[in-house]
Amino acid sequence: GELVLKNTRKPYKASVLGLYGQNGSGKTALIDALSILKLVLSGKSVPLQYAEYVNLEADNAKLEFTFSITSPQGTHNVEYSFNLRKCRNDNEQNMVNDKNDVRYMSRIYNECVKYSYHSDTEDIPKQTLIDTKTEKAFAPGTKYRLLIGNDPNDETDLIVEKRMASASARSFVFSSGFLKKFKEKCESEFYRQIIESLVFYGNYELFVITTSNSGHIAMGYLPLMFQYEEDGGTRTGNIPISLNDANYI
């Protein structure tokens, strides 16, 4: 399915976009998809529970997200997609005698970042920036050289990081190893804005309240997620808000 979360009305200072539907219509599936997105953009492992949601008749699920990154210079339209599947976890076992004792994990693979760009003076049609569906670190080669350079040692380091990310149910594109190399080598502000904007969004601007919070509500408090800036840095977190009494923050 596809859902557009863009507010097409006037640019209010604050607005609410609602999603309504019958039981079983997929409302919770949307929240789960956003939860996976936040984990991936934040460089965290995706729990097995999300891979368990993949249809039994399907080998994997493909998730696609489209972002609009606006700056005074112009607008990047960015598409980020990846596949999610359930696979055997060999990291926590080296011998299995009972087939029922096999452990599983999530796996993120076939990541792809595409972009287009529009400004008053320039239009760039949609093209691929990063595609991990290759034995190398990522393709296409022209973009690899722009983002990372030509040092073969960097290629080796990224291939190792790619395998480590796969083995720990994390994104390779948003792993700390890839981002560190990207920040060291990429001199293009144009491409840096794309990747760094997605990283910032996942860490500091995307907040997801899942059904697991229902237990907190039943206990009389609601987790309040927040973001604030101090000393040039951005911090996020959550604090419990009582549903029965006045709160002082």
Predicted regions and their residues:
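Post-Walker A helix-loop "phosphate-sensing" segment adjacent to the P-loop in P-loop NTPases
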Residues: 37-48
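Pre-Walker A-like glycine/lysine-rich segment at the N-terminus of P-loop NTPase domains
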Residues: 1-35
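A short, structural micro-pattern
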Residues: 59, 76, 105-107
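Extracellular structured ligand-interaction cores
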Residues: 16, 60-64, 79
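AAA+/P-loop NTPase substrate/partner-engagement loops
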Residues: 49-71
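Short, surface-exposed coil-to-beta transition loops
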Residues: 75-81
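Electropositive, glycine-dotted interaction segments
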Residues: 85-248
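Short, flexible loop/turn elements at secondary-structure junctions
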Residues: 23, 67-71, 84-88
